[in-house]
Amino acid sequence: MNLGIVLSEILAEAEYTPSEIKELLAQAGYDVSLEKLTDHLNLLVTMGSARKHPDGKFSTLPF
């Protein structure tokens, strides 16, 4: 499965911190740096595909 799909599935499950997401991606076989992951998550927020909560956790936007 591709990284983007796995990340989308993770974000759809619940709210996670970037560190928690990195760990879940590692369990799925993906090695991503925390810095690049955080940058990508912030890009998803900017594009309107994800939400960043006040506590620093990320999730997908509800449809």
Per-segment meaning from a language model:
Residues 30, 44, 63:
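Short Asp/Glu-rich motifs
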Residues 26-40:
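Short, positively charged loop/turn segments that connect secondary-structure elements
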Residues 16-25:
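Short acidic, hydrophobic short linear motifs in intrinsically disordered regions
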Residues 55-63:
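Short, cationic-aromatic polyanion-contact patches
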Residues 23, 37, 56-57:
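Proline- and acidic/polar-enriched loop/turn elements at helix boundaries
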Residues 1-15, 36, 41-49:
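Positively charged, polyanion-binding regions of nucleic-acid-associated proteins
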Residues 6-7, 24-27:
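A short, structure-level motif marking secondary-structure boundaries and short turns
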Residues 52:
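Short beta-strand "wing" residues that participate in macromolecule-binding interfaces
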